[in-house]
Amino acid sequence: MAGVRLSLLKSIQRSIKPHATAKSCSGLLNSHARAFTCGNLLDGPKASPSMISFSSNIRLHNDAKPFNYLGHSSYARAFSSKSDDFGSIVASGVTGSGDGNGNGNDWVEKAKDVLQTSVDAVTETAKKTKDVSDEMIPHVQQFLDSNPYLKDVIVPVSLTMTGTLFAWVVMPRILRRFHTYAMQSSAKLLPVGFSNEDVPYEKSFWGALEDPARYLVTFIAFAQIAAMVAPTTIAAQYFSPTVKGAVILSLVWFLYRWKTNVITRMLSAKSFGGLDREKVLTLDKVSSVGLFAIGLMASAEACGVAVQSILTVGGVGGVATAFAARDILGNVLSGLSMQFSRPFSMGDTIKAGSVEGQVIEMGLTTTSLLNAEKFPVLVPNSLFSSQVIVNKSRAQWRAIASKIPLQIDDLDMIPQISNEIKEMLRSNTKVFLGKEAPHCYLSRVEKSFAELTIGCNLIRMGKEELYNTQQEVLLEAVKIIKKHGVSLGTTWDNSTL
């Protein structure tokens, strides 16, 4: 049926004039489309109401593709099966609508069109701006050349003062807006449940940048004004190194402020323990020294000083200096190593070789201890790199061991005494039972006495409490021995007296 209609349309198209072909053909096609979608088809089911209402709005123009949204694949195939131009036009208008990915392709094409339009608009605006500036620059240059005072004094001073006012009034507000936007963006990027602590502006990256940037702009502005006011007093060759040095110092100042803010926030966090806090403090000191050294060398290079040559020449003499001061350098390196490894901290009781005491100060070259007699002892840091360090304060438990001599005549009662002493130790709340069980056994038998050894682990406690607990354990053990009628012995051999 569709083929018959196509034949009729083609015969009518041949009979009309060429200049009216497009218009008449469009009208016939519109009529044919309405007839096709009205639902009175002889070779197919009745069309849906949505298709009828949609197809009734179709209008074909002489420059548009017919049946662009008809959406009937069989009709498209009937027209596209012919080899003439008209059938190819109809097929090209229908083929895209029958594809399920048409909407996605349309959106991609629209996005490309919008992007291309934006690029063209920006390019055109830039071109027009460049043309206007090219036209205005000669006139402005001619005006400034005719007014030397305006060109040499008023305009530079005005621009300099404007930049200074911008740095002191407008820039802090812009930096605060950047800080607010950064905090909001970080909150959006962080996953749900992740702790997001609000950082105040004064302790943020932007807060650390504010003062160095303001003072740098102000310094450059006044240096520029001074060079204009007194060009003979301030030589031109000194202006560029001065500005470079100011930029370097401002950068070092900014890095130091930012580093201080970050470390302060880290130390204020509750998740940092004692050892981590000490490491962060050490990192703070080392980074400060490094920033100072880098800033000093960069400033010297900016001022024309050949730092590399100085370091090369100084390296030769540095070898001899290193041999002469190897003890000092050894103490310094050992101090830096201890700052990072942290074998002990302030307040710990340590023992290194023959030195024992409580740590009261840790320096870069020496460490101060307080010995048992409460005398301060100054120990070189190089000693700790060659000795075994025992840190008593970090022990999770303390072991005690005591030996009690008994009379040799009471050996039969020792097994019963040992069992009762072990039960007494197990029932003590200050005895640590996690690693080793308390023990009490006969460790030595001599001619005149027998020796009973008592040992256990105590929980972590202070020195005074440790001594009191040890005394309590010994007194309880003596009570058990006395209860069984056993007398304490002596380790001296009376036969030799």
Swiss-Prot record:
Lineage per the UniProt record: Eukaryota, Viridiplantae, Streptophyta, Embryophyta, Tracheophyta
GO molecular function, one term: mechanosensitive monoatomic ion channel activity
Transit peptide per record: 1-86
Cell compartment(s), UniProt: Mitochondrion membrane
Official protein name in the record: Mechanosensitive ion channel protein 1, mitochondrial
Claim: Transport is one of the keywords in the record: yes
Coiled coil location: none
Keyword Transcription regulation: no
Keywords carried by this UniProt record: Ion channel, Ion transport, Membrane, Mitochondrion, Transit peptide, Transmembrane, Transmembrane helix, Transport
Superkingdom classification of source: Eukaryota
Membrane topology: Multi-pass membrane protein
PANTHER family, sorted: MECHANOSENSITIVE ION CHANNEL PROTEIN 1, MITOCHONDRIAL-RELATED, YNAI-RELATED MECHANOSENSITIVE ION CHANNEL
Any one GO cellular component localisation term in the record: chloroplast envelope
Biological source species: Arabidopsis thaliana (Mouse-ear cress)
Cross-referenced SUPFAM superfamilies: Mechanosensitive channel protein MscS (YggB), transmembrane region, Sm-like ribonucleoproteins
GO biological process, alphabetically ordered: cellular response to oxidative stress
Entries under InterPro entries matching the protein: LSM_dom_sf, MscS_beta-dom_sf, MscS_channel_2nd, MscS_channel_TM-2
Main subcellular location of this protein, as a coarse class: mitochondrion
Function as written in the Swiss-Prot or TrEMBL entry: Mechanosensitive channel that opens in response to stretch forces in the membrane lipid bilayer.
Gene field: MSL1
Transmembrane parts of this sequence: 152-172, 216-236, 238-258, 280-300, 305-325
Family stated for the protein in its record: Belongs to the MscS (TC 1.A.23) family.
